[in-house]
């Protein structure tokens, strides 16, 4: 009940983006019934993005939690049965939208794992696909390097705009971004400054031109090449924004290790740290 208009709109945008993601067949939306983010508003937002199957469950109207759960499960099972009848089709890489992320970083992230992701990104772009570079707070100190790669003056200016907005927001509450970034874990792993961390972070974007800057969770068009999404440095929130924007898969580098995933999109974990690869084998997919 505490959401105001911009927060509420963002919530609806993300839910609509999740429903529209290519990995999703259909959506069951569950609500309490008296929140600000009303069911009819959410349904409208979803229907503006996609015509996929959509069902609604309102707990207060269903007769309580247990009845609402039964109803939602029944709807979900119906959709699973329908989805199982679909036939897989091959699509070109140009239809692929890949999100890139880093978390639990250490020096091996910038030296090995992120450059590997950058090479992948360049290959996706060369094949006509789309790669999303995220985490605006981790461009700070390296934003001028990204801006030099902007495809247009508008993109150049937007890169500086999103970075400066984060810095200004922190100053408004008397904080400095460098007081919380790098994190204690980053420092324990060997990263010394925010600029060092940012230089490693932007390696995930390879060497391709930056063609666009998207707001958080907004629909990313296919065949866009390298683009930026204005996301926070918080890993689950950043990944959620890219998936809401249409990313079908996320490639995630980590030096110290992290289990962060996503319910809709596969999250492939890459590390450049052999100790982390050996220690967290159930969380890490690739040793870079």
Regions found by a protein language model. Name each.
Residues 1-288:
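Metallocofactor- and cofactor-centric catalytic cores in central/energy metabolism, strongly enriched
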């Amino acid at each position: 009940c505490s959401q105001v208009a911009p927060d509420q709109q963002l919530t609806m945008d993300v839910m609509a983006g999740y429903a529209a993601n290519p990995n999703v067949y259909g959506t069951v939306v569950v609500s309490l019934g008296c929140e600000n983010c009303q069911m009819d508003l959410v349904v409208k937002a979803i229907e503006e993005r996609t015509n996929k199957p959509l069902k609604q469950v309102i707990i207060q109207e269903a007769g309580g939690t247990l009845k609402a759960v039964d109803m939602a499960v029944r709807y979900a099972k119906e959709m699973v049965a329908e989805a199982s009848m679909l036939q897989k089709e091959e699509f070109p890489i140009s239809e692929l939208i890949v999100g890139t992320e880093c978390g639990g970083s250490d020096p091996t992230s910038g030296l090995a794992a992120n450059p590997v992701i950058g090479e992948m990104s360049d290959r996706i772009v060369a094949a006509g696909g789309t790669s999303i570079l995220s985490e605006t707070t981790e461009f700070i100190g390296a934003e001028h390097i990204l801006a030099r790669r902007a495809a247009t003056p508008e993109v150049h200016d937007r890169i500086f705009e999103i970075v400066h907005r984060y810095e200004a927001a922190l100053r408004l509450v008397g904080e400095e971004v460098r007081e919380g970034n790098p994190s204690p874990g980053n420092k324990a792993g060997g990263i010394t400054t925010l600029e060092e961390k940012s230089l490693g972070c932007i390696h995930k974007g390879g060497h391709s031109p930056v063609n666009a800057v998207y707001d958080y969770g907004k629909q990313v068009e296919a065949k866009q090449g390298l683009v930026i999404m204005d996301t926070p440095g918080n890993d689950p929130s950043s990944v959620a924004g890219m998936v809401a924007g249409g990313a079908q898969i996320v490639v995630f580098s980590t030096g110290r290790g992290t289990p962060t995933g996503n319910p809709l999109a596969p999250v492939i974990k890459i590390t450049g740290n052999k100790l982390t690869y050996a220690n967290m084998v159930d969380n890490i997919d690739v040793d870079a």
